[in-house]
Amino acid sequence: MTTLRCKTVIGGSAKGKAMVTRQPINFTAAMCKVPNMLPSKRAEIRDSHHELFKQNIAGRVLVFPSCIGSTHTGLVLLDLVSMERGPAALVVQRNDSLLIAGVVLSNVWFDRKIPVVEYESDDLYDLIRDGADVEVDGDAGEIRVTNP
């Protein structure tokens, strides 16, 4: 097991399988498509230009560089987390307020919290591989990784 020190953005702890991408994610473009709408309410990346196309982020530890795109990003994450379809945790290289707004609101409004941590170094993708078992401890500022 490898333990990484990180910056806490939103505390809490979670664990799950890593879903890793080096591409920034536009959550609005990725999630606001017909297969993710009612009644099925899935959590699949539906941006056909993204390497995670057709992958389900629910319950995964999402590891990515940053978010891009719309101010709607927070609302997309709010919807996913409040419906229990969101990722288990977010590990991001460059955090921003658009990314965490929905996560904060899901905690305040629905008492559903997911940890968000920032790990800025580019060795992130060498240290956490897709499918790794990851524990994110936002309270301690640690990411614990067991790679396959």
Model features per residue range: what roles?
Residues P148:
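Active-site/ligand-binding-proximal alpha/beta "capping" segment
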